[in-house]
Amino acid sequence: MQLSLPQILSRRDWENPQITQYHRLEAHPPFHSWRDVESAQKDRPSPQQQTLNGLWSFSYFTQPEAVPEHWVRCDLAEAKPLPVPANWQLHGYDAPIYTNIQYPIPVNPPRVPDLNPTGCYSRDFTLEPSWLASGKTRIIFDGVSSAFYLWCNGQWVGYSQDSRLPAEFDLTPYLQAGSNRIAVLVLRWSDGSYLEDQDMWRMSGIFRDVKLLHKPEIHLRDIHIMTHLSPEFTSANLEVMAAVNIPSLQLNDPQVTGSYQLRVQLWLADKLVASLQQPLGTQAIDERGPYTDRTQLVLRIDQPLLWSAEQPTLYRAVVSLLNHQQELIEAEAYDVGFRQVAIHQGLLKINGKAVLIRGVNRHEHHPQTGQAIDEESLLQDILLMKQHNFNAVRCSHYPNHPLWYRLCDRYGLYVVDEANIETHGMQPMSRLSDDPSWFSAFSERVTRMVQRDRNHPCIIIWSLGNESGHGATHDALYRWIKTNDPTRPVQYEGGGANTLATDILCPMYARVDEDQPFPAVPKWSIKKWIGLPNESRPLILCEYAHAMGNSFGGFARYWQAFRQYPRLQGGFIWDWVDQSLTHHNDHGQPYWAYGGDFGDTPNDRQFCMNGLVFPDRSPHPSLYEAQCAQQFFQFSLLSTTPLVINITSEYLFRESDNEQLYWRIMLEGESVLEGSQPLNLSPESSQCYRLAEKLPTLNKPGQLWLNVEIRQPKETPWSPAQHRSAWHQWRLPQPLFSPSSDLTNATAHYAPQLQHNLQLQHDLQLQQDEQHIKVTYQQQCWQFSRQTGRLAQWWVADKPMLLRPLQDQFVRAPLDNDIGISEATHIDPNAWVERWKKAGMYQLQQRCLSLHVDHLSHSVQISAEYGYEFEQEPLLHSHWVYRFDRHGRMTIDVNVRIATSLPAPARIGMCCQLADISPTVEWLGLGPHENYPDRQLAAQYGHWSLPLEQMHTAYIFPSENGLRCNTHTLNYGRWTLTGDFHFGISRYSTQQLMVTSHQHLLEPEEGTWLNIDGFHMGVGGDDSWSPSVHIDDILTRETYQYQICWQYKV
């Protein structure tokens, strides 16, 4: 008997954790039901599939009870078109909500709010009589959030929840030739929402593909493919377990079941490698006999080509179901990779080799389409990861779109497949995992994931979920996986990352050398962890290096440890992409939004933006740091006479057959000697390369650097030709300096001019009155204020060059890492920004303590002392000595003394606002991208030139940005600065960055703001909620000195 809509809704299935589905078919790998072997082998589109993607009719209600009963049979008058797949919140209905830990609904499991946003979808489609003449028709929803009911032609079909796994239903009894109508009622909240508390945008709707699939009456029901390699990896067995759907009344009739045959053909491109055919049936399982609806086929393969992320060689297995006349009923096909995953002697090994995981966590996210991801976006992520030396990705924190795994198989990425389970907002987190009434809901999310995805070679580890504590359910599901798929290890971080439910120590945000002894679940340093008594598992960080905004400091320390300790086998960076959504302001202009921008409450503001790439996949500077730290070639300088380097390949399987070594000896950013040669390295091998017999003799003084890089001359499936995969730089010892005759002649030529300059001492003039001190040289005049003691103006030809005077700067626009977990409603006194606020660093009162002028024989010297205090407490003392010489240069020596009561400042430097705006910035120092004292592994010393706008890093949440470290020369327009300093140059002041909430709200200011730092604190990045700048990168001394030389070229 068909139930009415009110009767169905009255059961409130979405508030019953023991009801996760009605009439949903069992999980299995993706099916295509090809009707010819060639199409299956070549992976052609299957005529048995019909997409239902496109425009659907959509009506929105605030709660399911408000849906009119007749909607299941016909569209409502107010219905409007809505694309599928899509999140309805991005099409004007309801609002996306971003939260990290806290649930977006009151925590009362399994209850959810009565006001439960509901989307009513419907679509008509047409089926020919031939489609319905025989067989069965299924409908497959690849992803619907969070729960839904399905009707076909007015009749209720079923119910499902779990947003991230397919829901498949048999539509055969409800279909008719011609026009058909399906209706889907989607609930935003369900008891399943309590298991989906991931750190992400909470959105709803049919956000993955929908399609019809036609299967024969007798058809393949499940296929499980495993590869087993010999100890020497010289041969392999391909094991295929296949089950067939046969009517139950025929299962015990051997004449019926035995008439069906299963055939497996293994192809390598167009070459048939092996084939095996046998009838249905297994060996006797117990005293009642065998299975009659399934069989096991084993093919032996000699000298198989192995699959790895480095060499993702794929075979193609075609599984055919044949009738008693040997005619094909249907075929399914899967890519097969021969590879072995094992933990042996404390090491995770791929094909017998200990692997170093160069991993990243990735949410399915697109700034325009939210959680609806297309193939182009999937492929873009994979190519970028491969190009930046990633070899692994964790599906955080749910099973991904089915196409993701196929692409990872083909392009070569190791995958941690993770169940769609997180209960982070529960107290305790294990509240539900220890509750038997929730066992079914937990278990289906794990078992169905395994059943869908287990044929993919890219998946090397199963994960039981994320941040859900540790309960009896986890132990049970761990054992289920180990029984049903003994070919892969299982990891689970909950409960301390080292419970019996994990084969791998997989902590998150454990530090290299620092213990975090939390009472319940201590996080030891990763070096200490692997040395604990009776602990022999490998350690792979499931999350580390929190890349939130201007972050990622100290990342290189992890990689030093990974390479030093074999059982530290890498980790997964948090995370890949800034989870910002495109929003529009009142004028219709787009901008990248974060939590709260949609009026969503509760929200966790900008905590959704932790990516190595911006939402449009353009790189953060931290991406280059990851690329360099993770590069597969390591370099060492053995000698300089002759010039010899050693290169080690960290590839486990591939030869360096597409690599060219390029080297250059650089003098102050200019090449003086260079060369290239092919790189011929076997896996895991080292080789010495003799680059030159000796260092070149120089005809001018300067510092020599040796730059080496490895490029790939030919394009690959994942990279263009000349892709740079690795690089390094060394500072070389100073060679002999032998001035050339040209230089000698040049000196002689300019000697009269130099002599003339010596005679122009009267051009350096000094004027003083009660308000100002002026130093004049030719067309330039430096004007000091006696009141402030500061350089108030720099005149050139009576034109003012400064919009704001030159002064000390000790603060920066707070980084996310500086802010930590401090916000309006919660203050973390340990956060750097709170320590600086409490100390008064943002409200310093400056006083000029003294001002002295000396007119020397060849220069004018002005000495000034400044005191900085807060609430009458002296905090900083700054002593500046300005020297003006007869060449129009201003040299400043700065000495800063810091009170012992003051927390370490963010910077010791100076700033001013220049009147000039020049299109280009040139410098000799570290570059070309933004770098900071604890994030400069990827930067190289050289001569760089960039447009002014590219000197600003457009972090969505504005903060300190754009620094370039270890600079010796800066040229900006007619300005030249020399010394040993860091600098940042921008159209935005520190003050504007501090008070502006979004990048798009920044307004270019008049002129240019120039920040010159003698010293700058690191940015940190082990995590973003506790102080994570390493002690070596904190300004802890009591005194600091630096010197800058300024010149304006008139």
UniProtKB/Swiss-Prot annotation:
Its EC number is 3.2.1.23. GO terms for molecular function: beta-galactosidase activity; carbohydrate binding; magnesium ion binding. It is an enzyme of class 3 (hydrolase). The lineage of its organism: Bacteria, Pseudomonadati, Pseudomonadota, Gammaproteobacteria, Enterobacterales. GO terms for cellular component: beta-galactosidase complex. It comes from the Bacteria. It comes from Yersinia pestis bv. Antiqua (strain Angola). Mg(2+) 1 binds at E422, H424, E467. This is Beta-galactosidase. Gene3D superfamilies: 2.70.98.10, Galactose-binding domain-like, Glycosidases, Immunoglobulins. The record marks H363, H397 as: Transition state stabilizer. It catalyses: Hydrolysis of terminal non-reducing beta-D-galactose residues in beta-D-galactosides. Homotetramer.
